[in-house]
A protein has these predicted regions:
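Short, flexible turn/loop "capping" segments at secondary-structure junctions
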Residues: 1-4, 48-50
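Active-site-flanking beta-strand signature of metal-NTP-handling nucleotidyl enzymes
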Residues: 3-11
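Short, surface-exposed ligand-recognition loops at beta-strand->loop->(often short) alpha-helix junctions
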Residues: 11-23
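An amphipathic, aromatic/His-enriched active-site/gating alpha helix that lines ligand/cofactor pockets
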Residues: 27-41, 49-50, 59-111, 115-118
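Residues on conserved beta-strands of the protein kinase catalytic domain
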Residues: 52-54
């Protein structure tokens, strides 16, 4: 099963400083529980068109693991709802995260890529 890489360009909300965003991610998102088969990474542009801008990289073990929680774009499964009910600290961190730089929303520029060769 090929790995899925979800790339999400992040634009910080007005008043959110990059250092604040990085600190929040490191202290609240990175240690939070994730749905099984998922890893989340915060990247910052160092060269190129998005220098200084953030990108969230979701590393998902397979298309099936993605679709288990998000069967269609913008649609959450009952299973992901239960996961966040069982992990309220992760739900609270995600809610705060979305206020800082919308992620997984209509304002999010994103694409899921499936590994075709490694």
């Amino acid at each position: 099963m090929p790995t899925v890489y979800g790339l999400h360009e992040i634009e910080l909300q007005p008043g959110v400083e990059p250092e604040e965003y990085e600190r929040f991610f490191a202290e609240e998102i990175a240690p939070s529980p994730m749905v099984p088969g998922w890893k989340v990474h915060l990247l910052k542009g160092e060269r190129g068109a998005r220098v200084g801008k953030f990108l969230v990289l979701l590393e998902i073990e397979s298309v099936e693991a993605r679709d288990r929680y998000f069967p269609n774009p913008g649609e959450e499964s009952e299973e992901v709802t239960r996961f966040f009910e069982q992990h309220p600290e992760a739900a609270a961190a995600l809610e705060k995260w979305n206020k800082m730089g919308p992620f997984g929303s209509k304002t999010d520029i994103s694409t899921d890529y499936v590994a075709v060769a490694e």
